[in-house]
Regions:
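Conserved GHKL (Bergerat-fold) ATPase module
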Residues: 1-344
């Protein structure tokens, strides 16, 4: 009598006799049951709407049954807008207080057209994400969607009150116009070095403090969705490879690392350290953007090489150390021979 997402609702329905199947154990499906199911769902939503008027009591209810509401948003298209009004999210402006979508819209800037959100593993991880740096600076509110079910809900929940839901972790986010012409050579060289690891390199309009970040295509999986799908033992490898589209590396043109890298590449300094820095920048972006790293061995080797450079260590130091050991062994051997001759 109730849809799956209302499985937590318990009650008794008083009605006239209903037809049973041959075994007399189950009700036969007929129009009366459909009407009852529709009315029960309607009444349940009305009760939740009344409960939401008291935010303190509704918070306890929402903490226990938010996943059911989001499942309903995914499955029940006829009640999707009503259920969306019942959703609550933490935001970058209100990390400790749950906000409704209506509250978000009322606080939007005059020139803001879309609802921005970020998905992730936890509230703490998305708060420190490089994707919200520029939005924080501009005072734009971002919804934190940190439940695993949010990724599935967003596949059906595309807009609310004629406002599009836009992910801040995907390509296509336009905050400011950036002058990118002088960085074309830098982007091209980095793309050549990283090869098939990325689709392209571009100047970012979303990061302020971080040197770079990795974004996905608008219709591909987010980093959080990739993490969820990799954790599924029975996942389809073919569809996973299709949806895990190549990443786009975005650079912060105002960061000192990017400026120095541009200077070296413009001066044709394509030494091993520059290539290591480029690859390391990609690796760091991979981790900071929420993706998992597959080749940890190569990452560790690059870190060790950068440590050696920082300590002014190179291969010559190793050779010199080896020669000193050989000389010391020779001197010790000669001293032993002299001592034996004196004994004789």
């Amino acid at each position: 009598l109730v849809p799956d997402w209302l499985s937590f609702v318990k009650g008794i329905v008083d009605s006239e006799d209903l037809p049973l199947n041959v075994s007399r154990e189950m009700l036969q499906h007929n129009n009366i049951l459909k009407v009852m199911k529709k009315n029960i769902t309607k009444k349940a939503i009305e009760m939740m709407e009344e409960l939401s008027e008291d935010e303190d009591n509704y918070k306890n209810f929402y903490e226990n049954y938010s996943k059911n509401l989001k499942l309903g948003l995914y499955e029940d298209s006829s009640n999707r807008n009503k259920l969306a009004k019942l959703l609550r999210f933490y935001t970058n402006k209100n990390p400790e207080t749950l906000q409704s979508l209506d509250s978000y819209i009322s606080n939007m800037k005059d020139d803001q057209k879309d609802i921005y959100y970020i998905t992730g593993e936890s509230k703490e991880s998305v708060m420190d994400s490089p994707f919200v740096e520029k939005l924080n600076k501009q005072g734009i509110e971002v919804l934190f969607m940190v439940d695993a079910i949010d990724e599935y809900t967003l596949q059906q929940f595309k807009d609310y009150e004629n406002k599009k839901l836009v992910s801040v972790t995907k390509d296509g986010l336009k905050l400011d116009e950036e002058d990118t012409k002088e960085y074309e050579t830098l982007c091209q060289k980095i793309k050549e070095h990283l090869g098939d690891k990325i689709e392209k390199v571009q100047i970012s309009s979303r990061i302020v403090d971080s040197p770079s970040c990795l974004v996905t295509s608008e219709f591909g999986w987010s980093a959080n969705m990739e993490r969820i799908m990799k954790a599924q033992a029975l996942g389809d490898d073919n569809s996973r490879g299709y949806m895990m589209s190549k990443k786009i590396l975005e650079l912060n043109k105002d960061h000192k690392i990017v400026k120095e890298l541009k200077k070296r590449i413009d001066n044709n300094e394509n030494d091993s350290s520059t290539k290591d820095i480029t690859t390391l920048l990609y690796d760091v972006s991979l981790l900071r953007s929420g993706f998992t790293m597959d080749d940890t061995k190569q990452f560790s080797n690059r870190i060790c090489r950068m440590i050696e450079l920082g300590l002014n260590l190179d291969d010559d130091d190793d050779d010199e150390h080896s020669e000193n050991n050989v000389n010391n062994d020779t001197e010790a051997s000669n001293e032993e021979e002299i001592a034996m001759e004196q004994v004789d």
